[in-house]
Amino acid sequence: MTKVSQRGITLIEMVVVVTIISLIVAITLPAVTSGLDSLRLHQAVRDVVSLFDAGLSRAERSQQVVEISVSQHDNALWIDAPDAHFERRMELPEGVSITRVLPEVPNEDESGVRSFFLYPGGSVPRFGIEMRNRRGVLRRVSVDSITGVPRITSPEEQPNG
């Protein structure tokens, strides 16, 4: 009689393989989600810079007053040029929130809307926002009142205000 050999894997081998795969996923998943949170924050910061640039250049090109509004409660920003019939709205992506609107106003209600007016040919007011992602990483986008150029910084890189 010939004995038929069977090939295959045992249940123990399968459990070991599944355990190894689970460990690999458990180790790499936090790094992947952290990377996604960083990408969301980076993109949100670039979008805010673009919005500020659009408002600043719109005021100069159209020679009209442009209003930049920030709603910390709604996690949104928008620019509005009433005389030029121009409006652009931006909501921050999920996982990114506005933590501060600069300059801070004492006893200000966070549910309110802050507005900054850009006058053509005039000096640019100093303003900005601070954003945070789920991991607690902060970025600040502020407009330099001398050059009128938006700057991206980490709050640790500059003094408050």
Task: Report each predicted region and the residues it spans.
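N-terminal helix-rich module
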Residues: 1-3, 27, 31-50, 57, ...
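N-terminal single-pass transmembrane signal-anchor helix
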Residues: 1-32
